[in-house]
Amino acid sequence: MAMRSAYVRRGISALFVLAIALCTGNAASAQSLDWEGQTGALITPFAYTAKSPAKGIGKPAVAFHYLSGGIILNDAYQASITVGFLGRVEAGYTRTIVSDANDTIYNHLFDEGFNTFHGKVNMIPENMGKTTWVPAISVGFVARTNEKRGGLALVNLLTVPNPYGTTETYDFYLVGTKTITQIKHLPILLSAGVKGTNASILGIVGAAPDWEARAFGAAGFVFTPGKQTLILGAEALQEPNQIAPKTGDAAIPGISIPTTLAYFARFVPSGVPLNFDLAVAQIAGCIEGPCTNGEGLNLHARSRIGIGISYRF
């Protein structure tokens, strides 16, 4: 456990050194990837896709994200790569690595990493038909594999031999995004969508007992001080209210998952294809009450810090 934490710390140091080195590269536009590797904010995708030519494959974008999950959810590290092609499609892969330096009763339910694959197709480009009001509209999916977290981990922990092993969770979504530029010196970014999902908190807490339609959205103000770009915004992501070992199983009694909120700042320096993200995520606190006198289950993840770095080659 200590050895894995040491490797993670070395990896973070190497990534920051790489980021500094990349700042000396050729100028280009930045590519902003979210927690799961999609073009987006922190926890929600935008309708935009990774940059690519209309008749070819674009250069890849890479990202690293870190979330201080607390004593229960543990620290999570995301390494992503995303590629755009045909001017309107993107696809990518993200690996989640977890550092379980804590040793509590519950944190071992959330100490396993997993894989995430995603794809997105832009159906309607922004400002189509030479208009100024048409949003970009896209459809996409997210597939998370090799998950052993939350309810599944609890069942495996209490039963020998493990009855399940791993599970998968998925999102299928429709999203619209518009950058409003009519307000002088203050562009506004608005994004909203709906998804069908069987995942709880992007798979961080595991699976939901059934598929549900959940809404999500983001809004941000774009500032351009001294040719730099600073985006300040907020996001909301509805969650399935319950969790289960696997989709189709009975819900674990007494659990209630709240809507996930995030407040983010994105800085894009002038002249380099790089951006930095800083966010505060309200994930979940007491999900099984009353969480007093040692009773209930408190995830202690109401105000968690996240950071991210994205770079496009």
Roles of regions detected by a PLM:
Residues 1-9:
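N-terminal secretory signal peptides that target proteins for export/translocation
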Residues 13-23:
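Bacterial N-terminal signal peptides
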Residues 29-172, 177-182, 242, 248-251:
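Transmembrane beta-barrel domains of Gram-negative outer membranes and organellar outer membranes
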Residues 62-68, 91-95, 137-145, 190-196, ...:
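Transmembrane beta-barrel strands of outer-membrane/channel proteins
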Residues 79, 117-119, 174-176, 217-219, ...:
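Membrane-embedded beta-strands of outer-membrane beta-barrel proteins
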Residues 83-87, 121-123, 178-180, 221-223, ...:
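Residue-level signature of outer-membrane beta-barrel architecture
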Residues 116-123, 282, 297-313:
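Outer-membrane beta-barrel "beta-signal"
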Residues 161-253, 259-260:
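Detector for outer-membrane/organellar transmembrane beta-barrel domains
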